[in-house]
Amino acid sequence: AASDVYKRQVEWYHSIGTEKSPGTKAFALTGNVVNTGLIEVPMGTTIREVVFDIGGGIPNGKKFKAVQIGGPSGGATTASDEHLDLPLDFDSLKSIGAMIGSGGLVVMDEDTCMVETARFFMRFTQNESCGKCVPCREGTKRMLEILDRIIANEGSLEDLDLLQELSKTISETALCGLGQSACKPVQSTLRHFRQDYLRHVVDHHCPICNGRKRRLVIKPELCKGCGKCKRNCPMEAISGEIRMPHTIDNDKCIHCGACWGACPFGAIDAIEEED
């Protein structure tokens, strides 16, 4: 859009989008959607248009379940018409506890456990915490421990109350924006997908994830040792020499998927750990 703005001036750019959120926005569309990649749309474009018109809908005949908007500090929306027809602008997303943030749009289908999704983003945030303030450093660690317990089907209804309490405390007392928004994925999934939590803490069985633990591995027979996964890993969890099979240290891995997206040979796989 930069060249167009330069040629046509700011008035033209402000004519696009909404009154309070003019212009366009670039989003990274990924997840369980037919067409993934970077897209640029007018502010105010609805989630339905992005997922089903631009994204091509959900592959393999699966049902749409949610979109995580705004990266690890964002919130999840549901498959309700109210959320699907929500404009992607600052005020509309704020009204449901989400945010544009980094512009990430992760589409999820019916085979996604939202508790696992919340844990995924909490693990990332906990690893990224600088550790300066206690609410973020210790609070996110405690929340991650609770989510681990819930995923293992060992949680309780009291854990859900504790997650709510910790989320409120951390968001109100953390020193920087990372800590203040770190709990949004947990807060939004508790609000909109509470049934997923209840399957773990009441039924003690989730038909989607069954409390399974997964780890990422590199298949040596497919790995060419190109090093792309290693260069893209934000946690330096991948090791290996050029032209030799690489390996992933799952003690460092945060399951962000950067290696999976970077590998041109399909050598990255997720396997279930034995109990």
Predicted features and spans:
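Short amphipathic, charge-patterned alpha-helical segments
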Residues: 44-59
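Short, small-residue-biased leader/transition segments that mark boundaries at the very start
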Residues: 1-6
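Terminal amphipathic helices with adjacent charged low-complexity linkers/tails
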Residues: 59-93, 191
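Ferredoxin-type iron-sulfur electron-transfer modules in oxidoreductases and energy-metabolism complexes
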Residues: 85-215, 220, 235, 240-245
